[in-house]
């Protein structure tokens, strides 16, 4: 497993249906972009706190993390406390 550098994305096993829905949407978007890409560039950008590689992925010249953020299915992240994906109860 790897993590995209610089983003926080919702979890497929998230705490609420909204988070799980957004996670499925993000997963589908990533899959479609990778399968449809003519060129895929991956660069390791370090390791995260659990030891998984952090990577930057560029598909046909477009940064995948930025595309996820622009679609609202990921947030910028640089190690600070994560914001919840679930609405307040």
Language-model segments: what does each one mean?
Residues 1-89:
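Small beta-barrel nucleic-acid-binding modules, primarily SNase/OB-fold domains
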């Amino acid at each position: 497993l790897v993590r995209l550098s610089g983003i926080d994305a919702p979890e497929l096993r998230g705490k609420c249906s909204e988070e799980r829905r957004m996670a499925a949407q993000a997963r589908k978007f990533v899959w479609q972009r990778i399968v449809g890409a003519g060129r895929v560039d991956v660069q390791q950008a370090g390791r995260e706190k659990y030891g998984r590689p952090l990577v930057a992925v560029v598909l046909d010249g477009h940064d995948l993390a930025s595309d996820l953020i622009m679609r609202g299915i990921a947030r910028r992240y640089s190690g600070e406390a994560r914001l919840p994906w679930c609405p307040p109860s």
